[in-house]
Amino acid sequence: MKTTFLDFEQPIAELEAKIEELRFVQDDSAVDISEEISRLAGKSQQLTKDIYANLTPWQVAQIARHPQRPYTLDYVREIFTDFHELHGDRTFADDLSIIGGLARFNGQACMVIGHQKGRDTKERAMRNFGMPKPEGYRKAKRLMELADKFGLPIFTFVDTPGAFPGIDAEERGQSEAIGHNLYVMAGLKVPLIATIIGEGGSGGALAIAVGDVVQMLQFATYAVISPEGCASILWKTAEKAPEAAEALGLTAHRLKALGLIDKIVSEPLGGAHRDYKGMAAMLKRSLAESLRQFQGMSVKELQARRYERLLAYGKFKETGTQD
């Protein structure tokens, strides 16, 4: 699959195009230009390192939305075995913007739940662009309760612009569905490990992300509103999105510093979309480490730990005195 380059990656795109051109010439020529190709490849790699070492929050937001970025089902295929998808909320419908089902993680039975976007126009419409309606969140709740009943750890994968804001979703109780999920997750008797893999958009993300461990991929985002939405409210124009992204503090490193997430999972050079298998391998190791800490922990200990964790959000902390 040919890589799609973002606007700020155009210098890299130009180098990669030159490399491809030289490779094509080498195939049809007796002249050996492999050294020049290697030199340009090294230059491209260094340029990628330099650009990705100095990303702005707005650029990170663009990477989190990259159309080739791995989605939940991509990770399910690489990380889990024996995945069996479960459908429907048993109340209204089956929302395909959230997928979930039984699987095995390193041989252990578990429940997997996540947002799912689409790759092409037809699939994006089918998945509602990764924006769940109430039936999607109620499906997730049903699967969480099923996992709780059978003592299965839960892995959730967050990647949504936000909950669907349509009239039909509001009529069917969007806020109630999200709120009920928060209530259920807070009281689970099994560990829940949440990973923000792309966009973490407001309550639509939080509805499957009240975890005992919350981790983010290096170039994922997590915020109460999109940069464009914030800019439209504060400055009446979406053109101020870069400034809004800075103010929102939506990057993994910023959120880790604030204590809102627990771990950051490094991504391959150039982002997760450059190396699906490499990204999945790193994420699998991180998930295994997170799950291991709950081995032998009683339900009482697990819930007490979660209770303390949730109460710690938003605590005011004195850092010094002023004269």
Swiss-Prot record:
GO cellular component, one term: acetyl-CoA carboxylase complex
Pathway the protein contributes to: Lipid metabolism; malonyl-CoA biosynthesis; malonyl-CoA from acetyl-CoA: step 1/1
Subcellular location, record wording: Cytoplasm
InterPro entries membership: Acetyl_CoA_COase_a_su, ClpP/crotonase-like_dom_sf, COA_CT_C
GO biological process terms, semicolon-separated: fatty acid biosynthetic process; malonyl-CoA biosynthetic process
One GO MF term: carboxyl- or carbamoyltransferase activity
PROSITE patterns: COA_CT_CTER
Pfam families: ACCA
Function description: Component of the acetyl coenzyme A carboxylase (ACC) complex. First, biotin carboxylase catalyzes the carboxylation of biotin on its carrier protein (BCCP) and then the CO(2) group is transferred by the carboxyltransferase to acetyl-CoA to form malonyl-CoA.
Subunit record text: Acetyl-CoA carboxylase is a heterohexamer composed of biotin carboxyl carrier protein (AccB), biotin carboxylase (AccC) and two subunits each of ACCase subunit alpha (AccA) and ACCase subunit beta (AccD).
Record-given protein name: Acetyl-coenzyme A carboxylase carboxyl transferase subunit alpha
Organism lineage string: Bacteria, Pseudomonadati, Pseudomonadota, Betaproteobacteria, Burkholderiales
Gene for this chain: accA
